[in-house]
Amino acid sequence: MSEDILIPKWVWILVSLAIVLGLGFWVSPLDRDGRPLLLSPDVKAVEDYRRSLVAWHAKLAELDGRIARVLSNDYGGDLFSQSSDGQKALNETLQVLNEIDQTAAIPAAVPARELALNVANTTLIAAQSALIWVSAPTPANLSSAQQALDAAHTTMSILEASQWDETK
């Protein structure tokens, strides 16, 4: 004798509802307080761009530290390593700058985009100045590179103070 197990419709509805709610909870982005965001297309575009800005900021901050290391005397006379690290920092800064420039910004994010481009540009100038100093280590070139790095720090602090950057 084979007895069929009958599952009522309300059980199927509850299980389906639990699965849909679980998926929604799992894939929904969270705001800074950990609450799920209700995403309309506009809100999603703003949130996506904000996350891009935070990622660019983190990468530029890392590159800033690497440029500062190139300007320090931590290499013990190893010109090849110092030059190589400076060149890598320059190339990666250029990649971030291109990524910022090529990412479409929603109208509300245009000022934040300009801030990010400014930070990337000043970081690129600092990387170039560091490489000039590595190639010709004169006090004037070191001073110029330090000034460029200070300018990058200043623009970075302006980006950090903006409402778009939640890393603060």
Across the structure, where does each feature detected by a protein language model lie?
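Mid-chain, structured segments of secreted extracytoplasmic proteins
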Residues: 1, 16-19, 94-99
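Short, low-complexity patches enriched in S/T/P/G
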Residues: 1-11
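Hydrophobic membrane-insertion alpha-helices, especially the h-region
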Residues: 9-28
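Structural signature of transmembrane alpha-helix termini at the membrane-water interface
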Residues: 24-31, 130, 134
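Ser/Thr/Pro/Gly-rich low-complexity linker/stalk segments immediately outside membranes or between
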Residues: 27-48
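Alpha-helical segments in soluble extracytoplasmic regions
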Residues: 41-168
